[in-house]
Swiss-Prot record:
Sequence segments annotated as region (Interaction with MYO6): 397-488
Region (Clathrin box): 319-324
PTM field: Monoubiquitinated.
Motif (KRKK): 48-56
Biased composition (Basic and acidic residues): 505-515
Pfam families: GAT, VHS
Protein name: Target of Myb1 membrane trafficking protein
Domain notes: The GAT domain and the VHS domain are required for the interaction with polyubiquitinated proteins. The VHS domain binds to phosphatidylinositol monophosphates. The KRKK motif within the VHS domain is required for binding to phosphatidylinositol monophosphates, with a preference for phosphatidylinositol 5-phosphate (PtdIns(5)P).
Keyword Transport included in the entry's annotation: yes
Polar residues composition-biased segments: 169-185
Amino acid sequence: MDFLLGNPFSSPVGQRIERATDGSLRGEDWSLNMEICDIINETEEGPKDAFRAIKKRIVGNKNFHEVMLALTVLETCVKNCGHRFHILVASQDFVESVLVRTILPKNNPPAIVHDKVLTLIQSWADAFRSSPDLTGVVAVYEDLRRKGLEFPMTDLDMLSPIHTPRRSVYSSNSQSGQNSPAVNSPQQMESILHPVTLPSGRDTSSNVPITPTQEQIKKLRSELEVVNGNVKVMSEMLTELVPSQAETSDLELLQELNRTCRAMQQRVLELIPRVQHEQLTEELLLINDNLNNVFLRHERFERVRTGQPVKAPSEAENNLIDLRPSTPPAVRQPEVTNNLSSQLAGMTLGSRSVSAGLHSLDTSGKLEEEFDMFAVTRGSSLAEQRREVKYEDPQATKGLAGALDARQQNTGAEESSASSDGAQLTNWMMRQGMVPVPQANFMEDIEKWLSTDVGESEDGKGVTSEEFDKFLEERAKVADRLPTLSSSSAGTPVSPAAASRHQKQAKEDDAMFAL
């Protein structure tokens, strides 16, 4: 078939591949390799011509230096060319008949060529695993693993992404934008999110423990840093993005990050039980925890974005004590008052002692109103008050005697109806100054004086203010006419009857002036 198509090196790209893989070269010609990639991307027949030329240079060639240069050109083209070239080199036929055939024991290839071929197969299998039309290399890779073939550890220093941005031609009007990279382009996204192949040493399906060397530990830790970087980027995106306002490009990048991190977690889980290194095992476990946490956050993000219903609380949550205030079905809103009795009445304590205390507070409120009336009368003159008030008026309950008498009756009613709890509450309120303290002896003296004063009056009518003023003037005149006691008569003893009358008269005068 190749004979019918002619010489593979006769095409423009074939000629350059022939020069780039010449055995006389001491090393790779990278400028020529990149020129080959440009021709493949820009021409219609470039991928097929390059594929035929590379295949011709590798198959049956005993000059392994040329084979090594051809493998380098092949790797460069896969990393820098598009899907048209990937379909050709990722096919199962090319991988088995060209690459695997080259490293067969009968060909006796050097170790560097053997490792180079296995590295290419492994990296392509990891990169093309999610592409349905590029799974030929994946099938070959899995078959080689089942046969027990050991793949080399990945060298991160030499690792570069499979997919790189295509060559773009900028117009003269867009030269200013040439310096700023397009971070949201699909090619760069694929380049950033290419899953890094963690070292496996042996077939990961077996349980053979791995004791890594110092070089392997260094490479593994550098790869774990890449995993941590992806986890950090995904976590920051979940923090910044709003589920209902996220753009399509951001959601695509987030989904790609999620797939990449899940692929990395599978490799981490394979290494955890096999690595015989305590510190590395701790680092792997920590990375696995971070991956699980970011996956949970992503699931919650998707649940909110898609509007899925939130899970109902479990029965265990319903069994918890509800400390919120319970509201009855029909509650009458109390009126807002500043009265202390109204505030205490709103507290449903259900105790007779509290009822007795509220009754006493209501009584004290009435007394406050009565004393407020006395405060209002202080604005008028004393003569006007005496002309308007009769001291013996039975209806004059605004006086001090009536108020004190009402207070005594209320206090007596409280003491007779209150229980032992009510007495304790009343005593406490008295000590706090909330309820006036009853003065029984003082009340008895006032009542005794009032009854005596009423008995001595000849008529049932009270004394007016004018009569009281006249009485005071007469008393003053009598006092002026009294003789002055001499020093000789000062020591004369006074009879007991006169002393009793004088004392009684003094008490009456004091009581009158007190009113």
